[in-house]
Amino acid sequence: MRDLHNNIAPKRVISPVSVADNTAQVGQIIDRQGFQALEYVILTGSLSDADATFTVLLEEGDASNLSDAAAVADADLLGTEALASFTFAADDKVFKLGYKGNKRYTRLTITPAGNASAALLAAVAILGDPQLAPTANPPA
């Protein structure tokens, strides 16, 4: 049996944060070089505002600073941005969004609307199917 531990590289996207307004939470740019698979995992804690919605956007590009960023086409997503988006009712939940496009760089953004209270959230990227295994531990 092949293990998962030596074949993934987790990356921080959005550090755990308490969001109390409608400021977009723009994630770290993820570089896929050396990996053929990418999955974003979004985690929520307590979402206090009873009117809040949180919309997920995934962008891609070839420039390392994503100056050429464009929204990822639906055909290059595993799952949908709508399924990864959430409302105030999603306390303590986990959502996922996969990428199967061919661009080197991607970035996840979570944009709140109607949010005026503490909303706890975080996101990580899991790079998989490495060209070279085992992957570094601890992750680079």
Show the residue positions of the predicted features.
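Solvent-exposed, flexible loop/coil segments flanking beta-strands in beta-rich domains
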Residues: 1-34
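Extended, low-complexity, turn-rich repeat/linker tracts enriched in Gly/Pro/Ser/Thr and Asp/Glu
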Residues: 45-53, 114-118
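Beta-sandwich interaction modules
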Residues: 25, 76-116, 123
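C-terminal interaction-tip segments
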Residues: 1-12, 112-140
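Residue-level signal for short segments within beta-strands and strand-turn junctions
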Residues: 44, 58-62, 112
